[in-house]
């Protein structure tokens, strides 16, 4: 077996050989601890028949661990400068395909259809750049890809927010949006010291297991999420005040009061105390008016 890419010495050698410099604008932080990478792969529960989709492979540290476990790996890399590096570091692995494209602009569903077998066990596994964590995760979830789940290394604070429960200070619109599509579980906390360059914050590995169907049924998903966003626009305001100022307007205050009453929600409550079921009920009541 080839020597792991993710050691401080080998990472330094690869970067020096290719004259690579980190781009802050791309949020590039490379993992230099093989044990952490193996933990990520373990959380994904891949089998020799699984397929893996990676985002932001960097120099291939996580990619090689995935390639050793999965039948096939597809990795999206936005940075053209890393393509020749990956061609070299991943040369021993014939089951890896690297696509030089921004995953936010890519047709991931089409890539899956042309790369993997129909019905194959698929997982998204990635060490995501902090600055695009939420857009990437929401794109993947909203696309309703044929994957079992998503395992990502992200900023610990964001992972806490995604996995948060009602009534906690971390709970917000991101928690509800993610948990509408998947169950969320914090798997491993990761210190900032295992990255180069070292970021300012710690990370966490988050496991999202895709739901067969959402926990609630609503006529209009966009309307549900609009209500959720409005309800958290000002965390110190009541649900009624947030709805009036951020969604329905003062002229429709009576309708908001009626909808809350019909949904059995005290108008003096704050958004952070509402469950997704209560938000779904509220969205249906507001839509009637």
Curated annotation (Swiss-Prot):
UniProt-annotated location(s): Cytoplasm
InterPro entries found in the cross-reference section: KsgA/Erm, rRNA_Ade_diMease-like_C, rRNA_Ade_Mease_Trfase_CS, rRNA_Ade_methylase_Trfase_N, rRNA_adenine_dimethylase, SAM-dependent_MTases_sf
Keywords linked to the UniProt accession: Cytoplasm, Methyltransferase, RNA-binding, rRNA processing, S-adenosyl-L-methionine, Transferase
Binding annotation for S-adenosyl-L-methionine: 29, 31, 56, 77, 102, 127
GO CC annotations, alphabetized: cytosol
GO terms assigned for molecular function: 16S rRNA (adenine(1518)-N(6)/adenine(1519)-N(6))-dimethyltransferase activity; RNA binding
Catalytic activity: adenosine(1518)/adenosine(1519) in 16S rRNA + 4 S-adenosyl-L-methionine = N(6)-dimethyladenosine(1518)/N(6)-dimethyladenosine(1519) in 16S rRNA + 4 S-adenosyl-L-homocysteine + 4 H(+)
Pfam families per record: RrnaAD
Catalytic activity, EC: 2.1.1.182
Gene3D superfamilies: Ribosomal RNA adenine dimethylase-like, domain 2, Vaccinia Virus protein VP39
Family per similarity comment: Belongs to the class I-like SAM-binding methyltransferase superfamily. rRNA adenine N(6)-methyltransferase family. RsmA subfamily.
Function: Specifically dimethylates two adjacent adenosines (A1518 and A1519) in the loop of a conserved hairpin near the 3'-end of 16S rRNA in the 30S particle. May play a critical role in biogenesis of 30S subunits.
Name of the featured protein: Ribosomal RNA small subunit methyltransferase A
Lineage start: Bacteria, Bacillati, Bacillota, Bacilli, Bacillales
């Amino acid at each position: 077996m080839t020597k792991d890419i993710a050691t401080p010495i080998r990472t330094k050698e690869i970067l020096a050989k290719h004259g690579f410099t980190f781009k802050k604008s791309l949020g590039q932080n490379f993992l230099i601890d093989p044990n952490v990478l193996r933990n990520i792969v373990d959380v994904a529960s891949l089998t020799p028949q699984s397929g893996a989709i990676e985002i932001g492979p960097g120099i291939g540290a996580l990619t090689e661990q995935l390639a050793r476990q999965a039948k096939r790996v597809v990795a999206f890399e936005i940075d053209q400068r890393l393509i020749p590096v990956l061609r070299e570091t991943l040369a021993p692995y014939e089951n890896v395909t690297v696509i030089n494209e921004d995953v936010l602009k890519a047709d991931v569903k089409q890539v899956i259809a042309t790369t993997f077998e129909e019905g194959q066990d698929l997982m998204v596994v990635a060490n995501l750049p902090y600055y695009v964590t939420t857009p990437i995760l929401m794109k993947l979830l909203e696309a309703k890809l044929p994957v079992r789940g998503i395992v990502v290394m992200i900023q610990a604070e964001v992972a806490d927010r995604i996995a948060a429960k009602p009534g906690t200070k971390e709970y917000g619109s991101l928690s509800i949006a993610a948990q509408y599509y998947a169950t969320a579980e914090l798997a491993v906390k990761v210190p900032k010291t295992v990255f180069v360059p070292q970021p300012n914050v710690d990370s966490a590995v988050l496991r999202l297991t895709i739901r067969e169907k959402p926990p609630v049924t609503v006529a209009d998903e966009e309307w549900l999420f609009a209500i959720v966003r409005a309800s958290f626009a000002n965390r110190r305001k009541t649900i009624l005040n947030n709805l009036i100022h951020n969604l329905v307007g003062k002229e429709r205050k009576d309708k908001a009061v009626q909808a809350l009453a019909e949904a059995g929600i005290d108008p003096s409550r704050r958004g952070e105390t509402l469950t997704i079921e209560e938000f779904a009920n509220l969205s249906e009541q507001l839509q009637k008016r």
